[in-house]
A protein has these predicted regions:
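Domain-scale recognition of functional cores that engage charged ligands
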Residues: 1-150
Length: 150
């Protein structure tokens, strides 16, 4: 039997994903700010998305952000403004390209030097966002696993 300590979903999801984004920096991490700390509204809002910190499955996310959207947020401490990640349609379906997101789940048992990859989730999309709600009218989309060489 496994000695497992489980962190209930979705409470951990909020802290680990969106809440930590403003604290992370790197070449492959989209620049992110808490909305209440925003000093000036960027002129190039087409390159940003507006996300509520405490949402799930893309609910409340504004893809095509306007200045009025930002000014209309009543609780800016609960929102982030994040650089938009443009997914390229790299998988070829019979009729056109499909965008892909691959999520990796690692487990880190006590005493292990590093985490171990446990499973992955590959999500295919043709919509503005990745997820069922944004792709229900498209084909060759959905979730699966990805195979890789060991």
């Amino acid at each position: 039997p496994l000695d497992v300590e489980w962190i209930t979903h979705p409470n951990w999801f909020y802290r680990i994903s969106k809440f930590t984004m403003p604290f992370l920096t790197g070449d492959y991490i989209p620049k992110t700010q808490f909305l209440h700390q925003l000093k000036t509204i960027p002129a190039d809002l087409q390159n940003y998305v507006l996300k509520p910190l405490f949402s799930f499955a893309g609910q409340g996310v504004i893809i095509d952000v306007t200045e009025n959207d930002i000014k209309g947020i009543k609780d800016p401490q609960n929102w982030i403004l994040q650089e938009k990640v443009n997914y390229e349609p790299v998988v070829q379906a019979p009729d056109d390209g499909v965008k892909v997101e691959i999520r990796l789940l690692y487990l880190w048992p006590d005493g292990d030097e590093k985490p171990t990859l446990a499973i992955n989730l590959a999500r295919l999309s043709r919509g503005k966002m990745i997820g069922v709600r944004y792709n229900k009218d498209f084909d060759w989309v959905g979730g699966t696993i990805a195979f890789s060489k060991a």
